[in-house]
Amino acid sequence: AIHDSIIPGAVLCVVENGDISYLQAYGNRAVVPAQETMTTNTIFDFFSVSKPTGAVSAALLLCAEGKLNVNDYVSQYIPQYHSDVQIRHLMTHYSGLPAYMTAARLDSIYLARGTKMSRPAFTIDTIARCKRPSAVGEKYRYSCLNFISLQKVVEAIIGEDINTYMRNKLYRPLGNNTMGWLPADSLLDRIAPTECIDEVCIIGDVHDPLARIMMTGVSGNAGVFATA
């Protein structure tokens, strides 16, 4: 992929029985506006890997503590939510929800209504009331909205934002002090850019527009940053 210029670089990490047996950086982490060599401590936007490493992991931690059950209805935690959707439907993409909602359309509606709700609150309220293309359990449809919903379930239980919870509950105890949403400015020189348009690069901000604009960077569908 690097040779064919599909990606500028990568980091390969092999873990066996809990120990790193191989760790190597290849190529470059940036080529615009200047070339930067890839390093093993480069931090990446995890894109949709944020779903299992973020929202799902948080939900499973709560399940292990007896605070959440996959058969619970989402409406127990988000009262206005579709009444027939269970936690397991969110986790397995069988909620019937649309695949996505564009940030541009959501934000235009948000601004037009002049609501006092925050953008994240408006987003989950819109998801909770939206028209679904299929019935719950009827059809598998990969949906970012499932995991924004799961995030909000988690936050309703823990009483804090998922970023703070996961940093303290999982990432830092595992020794990964750089993992989480909204990476610190002090880490910017280690973060690989995700996209560059006219030599202006997205670095340290989640690439997904719905997560970046409507969820302000902390979202169940995207936004986790970490090393390999």
Feature-to-residue mapping (PLM):
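Short, surface-exposed loop or secondary-structure junction motifs
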Residues: 85-228
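Short, conserved catalytic-motif segment at the N-terminal edge
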Residues: 1-44, 67-71, 125-129, 202, ...
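Residue-level detector of alpha-helical secondary structure
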Residues: 16-17, 58-61, 169
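Amphipathic, positively biased hydrophobic alpha-helical segments used for protein targeting
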Residues: 29, 38, 65-68, 107, ...
